Amino acid sequence: RRPPRSTPLYSSAASDVYKRQVFEQSTMTLQIETTRAIAAQILRHRSFTFQEFSQRYAESNELGNIQLPDLRKQDKKNRQNSTDDLDPFVRQKLEAQMITLFSSSQSLYNQMIQEGVAKECARMVLPLCTPTKIYMTGSCRSWIHYINLRSAHGTQKEHMEIAEACRKVFTEQFPSVSEALEWE
């Protein structure tokens, strides 16, 4: 006899074979605020559908303040990893250069708009750390796969933080499935 479909036991049995149809029937949409660089990584997950905030139509003041990226040292053993041991003096020097670059980029963007250049052209000078919003919709199965994959070692720190935030929302929205996956 099968357990009732709404019980944790059913969810647990289904999680063992999470590719089954039961996880294709429910979906979740999240708004994710990130940078253009990380959004490009997220958009590669093809089992989701996406809508990204268009900088083409945004006013320049809507683009937000560009935050300095967290500079880390390249891991010498794993090319997909970074370490938090960058020399503080090197970090400080590079951050000062980034501030100058980002300010110059924003000024050039604003000047291009004032000169009548189309926003779709002017946005090309904006840094990859310009903030953006994406709306990400996927099935329960897609979210399980994404969260497991992007919470794992080897994922860029900023992307991993997004995956962990997605896991938090997922556990609130799908508590029985999360319990079966031992995410709680």
Question: Which residue stretches match the model-derived regions?
Answer:
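Family-specific signature for flavin-dependent thymidylate synthase
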Residues: 1, 11-184
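ABC ATPase NBD coupling module
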Residues: 4-5
